[in-house]
């Protein structure tokens, strides 16, 4: 009887080896993952879009930084005048370097005449 049990065991292991070698029996079990509430959400490619842009631009809750141009909102009137006079001096020096006359005004372009000519065509 011991011989039959040993033969059956050997036959069973040989059969299992043959099945594994043939690729019929999988080497690892693919168990289904546990379902959570998040897996029940359905995604529609063109479905409900009511909240699409709701969070656009809201990346953090930190207070906003000062203005991007570097000018603080509490600039005094004296500082503004100094900045404007500095900018005006730079513009005048640039015009002089380019050879633009400072005494006569810039020529006025007759947009009305040009517009009438275009509309008449």
From Swiss-Prot:
Intrachain S-S bonds: none
Top-level taxon of origin: Eukaryota
Signals that turn on the gene: Up-regulated in response to infection with influenza A virus.
Cellular location(s): Secreted; Cell projection, Neuron projection
Record keywords, A-Z: Amidation, Cell projection, Cleavage on pair of basic residues, Immunity, Innate immunity, Secreted, Signal
CC terms in the record's Gene Ontology section: extracellular region; extracellular space; neuron projection
Main location as per UniProt: secreted
Function: Stimulates smooth muscle contraction. Induces sighing by acting directly on the pre-Botzinger complex, a cluster of several thousand neurons in the ventrolateral medulla responsible for inspiration during respiratory activity. Contributes to the induction of sneezing following exposure to chemical irritants or allergens which causes release of NMB by nasal sensory neurons and activation of NMBR-expressing neurons in the sneeze-evoking region of the brainstem. These in turn activate neurons of the caudal ventral respiratory group, giving rise to the sneezing response.
Family from the record: Belongs to the bombesin/neuromedin-B/ranatensin family.
Protein name in UniProt: Neuromedin-B
Protein species of origin: Homo sapiens
Origin organism lineage: Eukaryota, Metazoa, Chordata, Craniata, Vertebrata
């Amino acid at each position: 009887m011991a011989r039959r049990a040993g033969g059956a065991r050997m036959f069973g292991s040989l059969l299992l080896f043959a099945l594994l070698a043939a690729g019929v029996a999988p080497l690892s079990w693919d168990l289904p993952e546990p379902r959570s509430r998040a897996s029940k959400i359905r995604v529609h490619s063109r479905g409900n879009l009511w909240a699409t842009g709701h969070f656009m631009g809201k990346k953090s809750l930190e207070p906003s930084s000062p203005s991007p141009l570097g000018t603080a909102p509490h600039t005094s009137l004296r500082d503004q005048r100094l900045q404007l006079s500095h900018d005006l001096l730079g513009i005048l020096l640039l015009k002089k370097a380019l050879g633009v006359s400072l005494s006569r005004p810039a020529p006025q372009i007759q947009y009305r005449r040009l517009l009438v000519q275009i509309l008449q065509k």
